[in-house]
Every structure is written in structure tokens, then in C-alpha cells.
């Protein structure tokens, strides 16, 4: 069983990985590598899903009567995760945008 701190660090790890994959997806799309961009977005999604699972476990623990421990590290982890989710959502939009721009320039 993981300790509370280990769980918090796992949130940070998966959030950071998800954000990194999302940023790499934007870079790939900018180069016209759309299949790679979509693959990277899927990896970002998998990382963020893992983080969400950890977050859900913490919420269930609190809902079943466990006392929540709110440390600065936990606040940082939650901020890190929410930022990563936003970056992933925006990255998906960027990939679509770069793909549309590529189609427009090849049709012209």
C-alpha cells in the first residue's frame, strides 16, 4: 500500500508526464507529423487517467470517513494535474488546427 506522500508524488509524476506528452504532440503536429501527434495525445490521456485514478482513490478515502490531509505538496499536485489537463485539452485543439492549416495549404 502506498503512503499518502507516495500517492501525492505519483499525482505529480503522472500529471507532469501527461503535460510533457501533450506538449510533444503540439511539436509533432507543427512538423506535420499528425499520426505521431495523435499517439502522443493518447499517451498524455493515459497518464492523466492514471493520475485521475489516484485522485479518485483519495476522494473515496475521504468520503468514507478518512481525515483529509491537505499539505502544500498536495495543493501543488492538484495544481499540477489541473494544469496538465488544460494543456492536454489545448494540445488536442492545436493538433486539429495544424492539421486544418496543412489541408488548406495543400488544397490551395
Curated annotation (Swiss-Prot):
Pfam families: PTS_IIA. Keywords: Cytoplasm, Kinase, Phosphoprotein, Phosphotransferase system, Sugar transport, Transferase, Transport. It is found in: Cytoplasm. Residues 2-100 form the PTS EIIA type-3 domain. GO terms for molecular function: kinase activity. The modification Phosphohistidine is found at residue 76. It comes from the Bacteria. The active site is at 76 (tele-phosphohistidine intermediate). The keyword Endoplasmic reticulum does not apply. The keyword Transferase applies. InterPro entries: PTS_IIA_lac/cel (IPR003188), PTS_IIA_lac/cel_sf (IPR036542). SUPFAM superfamilies: Enzyme IIa from lactose specific PTS, IIa-lac. Its main location: cytoplasm. The phosphoenolpyruvate-dependent sugar phosphotransferase system (sugar PTS), a major carbohydrate active transport system, catalyzes the phosphorylation of incoming sugar substrates concomitantly with their translocation across the cell membrane. The enzyme II CelABD PTS system is involved in cellobiose transport. The PTS EIIA type-3 domain is phosphorylated by phospho-HPr on a histidyl residue. Then, it transfers the phosphoryl group to the PTS EIIB type-3 domain. This is PTS system cellobiose-specific EIIA component. It comes from Geobacillus stearothermophilus (Bacillus stearothermophilus). The lineage of its organism: Bacteria, Bacillati, Bacillota, Bacilli, Bacillales.
